[in-house]
Amino acid sequence: PFIKVPIAKAKIYFKQKDKFKVESKGIAILPKQGMSDLTGFLSNEKKYSAVLGEAKTINEHKTRLISILPTDENSEIILAKVYISTSEDLIYRTVLTTKSSGTVSIDYEYNLNKKYGLPNKMTFTVDIKKFKMPKSVASDIRNNDKQKKYKDNEKGTIVLTFSNYLVNKGISDDVFKKD
């Protein structure tokens, strides 16, 4: 395994359209790609073209693929594949290919907050060789694991489980200011 991080509890704040913040007392490793990149990318319809694709069943949900291509050649996102339920209008999988971090696949599971389109679980699969770690964590790993060479196709998994959602409660912009 690349790194096994103990389970961490965190508070995640999100405010439309592009404000995102994580507060955690321990180590919380989140993929930069996927959490807010797709939301920001999709917020401007002039920045991409979308093409309807194949039907595919994901975890017993019938979905349709929408391939999203940037119109800006300098976009960090090269391709976004979004699998959306045909009956619920929920995303069940996204596959983001980026210039700097390779491919990140995200599977979504829903329960109580399904009506808001908010998942209770997200499972990220990342390219280990291209995944960007925080510098302090990456430094420790490199010092402890100098002999390990990661293959081009080696994958890592990050699982986020969400609970205690507070929806539409209003968040001050001050929450998102850097300390």
Feature-to-residue mapping (PLM):
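Gly/Pro-enriched, hydrophobic low-complexity segments
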Residues: 62-174
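Flexible, processing/modification-adjacent segments and terminal tails
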Residues: 3-90, 98-102, 176-178
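Short consensus segments that form the blades of beta-propeller domains
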Residues: 2-3, 151
